[in-house]
Each structure stands twice: as C-alpha cells, then as structure tokens.
Amino acid sequence: MATEAHDAGGATGYIVHHLTPLSSGEGFWTLHVDTLFFSVFLGAVFLFFFRKAAEQATAGVPGPFQNFVEMIVEFVDTQVKDSFHGRNALIAPLALSIFAWVFLMNAMDLLPVDLLPDVGKAIGLEYLRVVPSTDLNATFGMSISVFFLIIFYSLKVKGPGHFAMEFLFHPFSHWALVPFNLLLNTVEYLAKPVSLGLRLFGNMYAGELIFILIALLPWWVQPALSFPWAVFHILIITLQAFIFMVLTIVYLSLAHESH
C-alpha cells in the first residue's frame, strides 16, 4: 500500500496524505472531522467500559477486567493525593478521564499506518488522520480547557480581589514592580496551555511520522523496524498521557493555593 502511494505521488505525497486531516468548512471555521470523530468515539469507549466495570463491581473476587480498571483508578488516585493539596472532588475523576482519554487517542498510533486510511478511501474519504493527538487543534483544545479551569478555580478559591493582588504583587511586592509582575505572571499563565498542548502534539506527531517513514521502506525491512518502534512507542504514549494528567493536577493544585 505504501508502495502504491509512493508510486502515485512520491514519498512526500504519501507523508502529506497521511498527515492531512479530513476537513469541513473553510478558514477559521474549518472542522477536522476525523479528529472530532475519533476523539468522541474514544471518549465514548472509555465511558462505556469504565461504567461497565463500575456496575459489575462486587464485594467478592473481582474478575480480570475489574482488576485492571481498579488498578488504573488506584494509580490515578495516588497521583492526585501526591500532587493535589486542595479539596475538590472533581480533580480525581478529571485526572482519570484525561489519562484514559489521552492514552486511547495516543494508542491509535499503534494501528497499521494504511489500515484505516484505506478503509476510508474505500468508502469515499480522500483523507483520514486517525490519531487525534497528532492534531494541534485537539491538543490545544484540551490544554485551553485546562487553562480555563485554572482561571476558574483561581477566581473561585482565592476570590477576584486576592487573585488580582497575587497577579500584580507576586513575586515582587513593591508597587513600582507591578508592570514587571504583570508581564511575568501573564507569560507564566499563558505558557501553561501552550507547553501542555505542544508537548503532547510534538511527541505524537513525531511518532506518527516515524511509523509513516517505516511504511515507505521495502516490505521485508518494515517488521525489523516497526515492531521495536511500536514496543518503544507504547512507553511514549503512556508517558505522554501521564505527563498531561500530572501537569493538569499540579496546575489545578497551584490554582487552589495562595502565595
């Protein structure tokens, strides 16, 4: 399949085709339909299986699936207890949702490069990008949502007045340094969603690109490279989901604290 695409448009055409989203609309209102579909679908998969595990929870001996879900829940709960120092019942469910959702989106990278795009082509879709976290719109959508939660809880917990004073008089308390504090804190706040979104996007985009490059090689070379990279990539997709979750917890913990 990679050879056919290579012959049709060259290596560059093959790479561009796999990294081009299925879009609808123009300009600012362009929607990446494939990103929206796979994001919502994977979110629904997470909700379905975790709800099923919760409904099947019993006081007796749990099954393998329930053990697996409980292990993930306990792992996330431990991270929240270690990193979040406020009191908020939303943080643990939010952290669990972020970890599982981001992991599932990242895990789409482990599917054969041409599998779903060829299925899409068979039903008339010119483009189909199947890894939502390789779309900057998706990663920034999540990181900006976290940013809004940071602002919301900063205002709710500290109050507008205290939040403004903290913004203007931290880290330097002298009134003459208010402009410097304002600039410093603005950059610090804006850097959180930017770094959160770019980190996830950059790592997953690079991983997907390597899989695509491997698919361009002769078929007899591909297994020797794709299998080791896939095994290593399992660590990457898990680590990126973990980092996104932990940083979200830390940022929200800071929003609950006063300087």
From Swiss-Prot:
SUPFAM superfamilies: F1F0 ATP synthase subunit A. It is a multi-pass membrane protein. Keywords: ATP synthesis, Cell inner membrane, Cell membrane, CF(0), Hydrogen ion transport, Ion transport, Membrane, Transmembrane, Transmembrane helix, Transport. It is found in: Cell inner membrane. GO terms for molecular function: proton-transporting ATP synthase activity, rotational mechanism. The keyword Magnesium does not apply. Pfam families: ATP-synt_A. Its main location: membrane. One of its GO terms (cellular component) is proton-transporting ATP synthase complex. GO terms for biological process: proton motive force-driven plasma membrane ATP synthesis. The chain crosses the membrane at residues 30-50, 90-110, 135-155, 209-229, 230-250. Key component of the proton channel; it plays a direct role in the translocation of protons across the membrane. This is ATP synthase subunit a 1. It comes from Methylococcus capsulatus (strain ATCC 33009 / NCIMB 11132 / Bath).
